[in-house]
Amino acid sequence: MGVAKLTDQNTLVPDSKYAHVERERRYLLEDLPEGLTRAEHHLQITDNYITGTRLRIRKVRDPRTNKWVVKFTQKFAPNPNDFSRTIITNTYLSAIEAEMLSMFNANEIRKNRYKFEFGGRTFSIDMFLGDLFGLVLAETGFESDEEMANFPLPAFAHS
């Protein structure tokens, strides 16, 4: 009798009190929305997506305080055809834990994240850096599928 091996087919991801559903819409922008400038407060985010997994290490720096938050995240879409709903689990890491996990091969994405209020909602506006320089995305979250389905395209976004 051989040793049982883990595969995607025989490994379950059970419901967890630590994981939650994220409902988000993302929109492509040409630039920052009118009224928001690069000089405004933002967070500097570095995401390292561990090759071959659904895992990332996210480092978030507030340039006003020079303080960091580091999260180890699993994020996946239960329906591979619908990325508007994802299951996300975060674990906060110490600097030593983050350094230990940095040994894994990963694809890095860097961006500056701005908060933007529009139409009674808060949007995160991401301006990408490095290889994705010039890409600007807006995202906003929803409490329910119905709220998400009925939300109109914001005036500052492309269809």
What are these regions (language model features)?
Residues 2-159:
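Phosphate-end processing signature that detects enzymes handling 5′-triphosphorylated RNA
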